Curated annotation (Swiss-Prot):
It is found in: Cellular thylakoid membrane. GO terms for biological process: ATP synthesis coupled electron transport; electron transport coupled proton transport. The gene is ndhD1. Belongs to the complex I subunit 4 family. It catalyses: a plastoquinone + NADH + (n+1) H(+)(in) = a plastoquinol + NAD(+) + n H(+)(out); a plastoquinone + NADPH + (n+1) H(+)(in) = a plastoquinol + NADP(+) + n H(+)(out). This is NAD(P)H-quinone oxidoreductase chain 4 1.
Length: 526
């Protein structure tokens, strides 16, 4: 891979927030930190729009705008960045949600310099994860992102913030070990040491080594997505994190897990994926049903939304496991859609807490009269989350279903079982979301909740944040190509690569595709 442009545009996207963060301590007044952070976030987002609008070719499935500079040549470590259809939409999603999170944190008064410093560090690291093409650089950016999140929860979180932050860092740090194990297995597992993803994808590995690396990456990315039973850090983190951090946590950080699965497990370890894909499909179905059932039992608003996120990420797993272009399309669309929907719901949840000082569902109620704008936008976000036709959630889930049903890699009974379990989750989703709306906004207001003088509807700044998230949700729902055109050609190429790893004659079994050699051993049928 060689430098394809004279100006290192992708390096600018990563380094701008990372380096600009160190300018915050130099500001003469703390109140300037929010303006500074907003300027950096908006500039980076504008730079993304310019780069992808003028220098990116939507018709090309290969890596574009590639940059490669020797960093530590003694160990083959390069500053290697590139973008394709897998990373393009997620980079934009990261830029949009993080910039809006800065606006959402506008009234922060406790240590604003440190808060926005950490937020910009996290921003740059997220973009770096999506653009990195060197496994060691990918790992480095992944690790840089962990520390700001830990501190942002531990310092600005709720009463149990230390517990939630510690649980987050223990889970994610342990997961990082598996990224390192998988990376080293691939780097040393074939002739010629390399950390470059493109070079690793072109090499041939023993199947046993592929399975080892795949399992390691699956555990690491399964924690981040998260996948049941590696999910238990997420409800605690969401419960204690402030609203702006929950926006980024649900909107961007979870997508890093899905991106890692597609980029490494599917894109490079496609032969091992043949064996693990049925497991992913089952885990996806379990995620959907478990997340929906757990959400039903939550009395705390943010915990209900956290378990909802777990359920929605199950569709990503099923899409990845489908072996079809539609499945991969649906997985990416579900990540984009959920990122926007979760961000707006957690933002509006934070607004509700600011007004009422509680998120206990049995203590809320009757807020629709005092907060009609918040009620309308919260309802719109909830309807998008339950996959109402005309909104992005519907398109994402429908595409995943079609990808699974049209797959010829599984027996019809297996596909029907997965689809049935997913359908159970879809039926439960409106139950826990609509009951949540009823408990928060309908009924009689608890007289001990808060004085009416403290209740106020959305202000213009808050309306702007919510609408900037809801409009893309509606736009993608009505015209999905707004999102799918960014990755269509890439998913076609990845799906073709996956199908080349399947047996020449696909023999359908309830769980695993059967290798051609096993066909001869089967008794003849009448």
């Amino acid at each position: 891979m060689s430098n394809s442009l004279e100006f290192p545009w992708l390096s600018a996207l990563v380094l701008l927030p990372l380096l600009a963060a160190f300018g915050i301590p130099l500001l003469p007044q703390s109140r300037w930190a929010r303006w500074y952070a907003l300027a950096v976030g908006a500039l980076d987002l504008g730079l993304m729009a310019y780069i992808f609008g003028w220098h990116y070719d939507l018709r090309d499935f290969s890596l574009q705008l590639a940059e490669r500079y020797a960093w530590v040549p003694q160990i083959g470590f390069h500053w290697s960045l590139a973008v394709d259809g897998l990373s393009f939409p997620l980079v934009l999603l990261s830029g949009l949600i993080t910039t809006l999170a800065i606006v959402a944190a506008w009234n922060l008064t406790h240590k604003p310099r440190l808060f926005f410093f950490l937020l910009l560090l996290m921003y740059g690291a997220q973009v770096g994860v999506f653009l990195a093409q060197d496994l060691l650089l990918f790992f480095l950016m992944w690790e840089i992102e962990l520390v700001p999140v830990y501190l942002l929860i531990a310092i600005w979180g709720g009463p149990q913030r230390q517990y939630a932050a510690t649980k987050f860092i223990l889970y994610t740090a342990a997961a990082s070990i598996f990224i390192l194990v998988g990376s080293l297995a691939m780097a040393f597992g074939s002739e010629g040491f390399s950390l470059e993803m493109a070079e690793l994808g072109a090499k041939s590995y023993p199947l046993a080594l592929q399975i080892l690396a795949y399992a390691a990456f699956l555990i690491a990315f399964g924690v981040k997505l998260p996948v049941f039973p590696l999910h238990t850090w997420l409800p605690d983190a969401h419960s204690e994190a402030s609203a702006p951090i929950s926006m980024i946590l649900a909107g961007v950080l979870l997508k890093m897990g899905g991106y890692g699965l597609i980029r490494l497990n599917v894109g490079i370890l496609s032969e091992a994926h043949v064996y693990f894909a049925p497991v992913l499909a089952v885990l996806g179905a379990v995620n959907i049903v478990y997340g929906a059932l757990a959400a039903l039992g939550q009395n705390y608003l943010k915990r209900r939304l956290a378990y909802s996120s777990i359920a929605h990420m199950g569709f990503v797993l099923i899409g990845i496991a489908a072996f079809t272009e539609l499945g991969l399309n649906g997985a990416l669309l579900q990540m984009i859609s959920h990122g926007l929907i979760a961000a707006v719901l957690f933002f509006l949840t934070g607004i509700t807490y600011e007004r009422t000082h509680t998120l206990a569902l049995d203590k809320l109620g009757g807020l629709a009269k005092q907060m009609p704008k918040a009620f309308a936008l919260f309802t719109a976000g909830s309807l998008a989350s339950l996959a109402l036709p005309g909104m992005s959630g519907f398109v994402g889930e429908l595409t995943v279903f079609l990808g699974l049903i049209t797959s010829d890699a599984y027996a019809p009974t297996f596909k029907a079982g997965i689809a049935l379990l997913a359908a159970v989750g879809i039926i439960l989703t409106p139950i826990y979301l609509l009951s949540m709306l009823r408990q928060v906004f309908y009924g009689a207001q608890d007289p001990g909740l808060v004085l009416e003088d403290y209740l106020g509807d959305l202000r213009p700044r808050e309306m702007a944040v919510a609408l900037c998230l809801l409009l893309p949700i509606l736009g993608i729902g009505l015209y999905p190509r707004l999102a799918t055109q960014t990755y269509d050609v890439t998913t076609v190429a990845v799906a073709a690569q996956l199908r080349s790893a399947l047996p020449t004659e696909i023999v359908q079994r309830p769980l695993l595709p059967v290798q051609p050699a096993q066909v001869a051993a089967l008794p003849p049928t009448d």
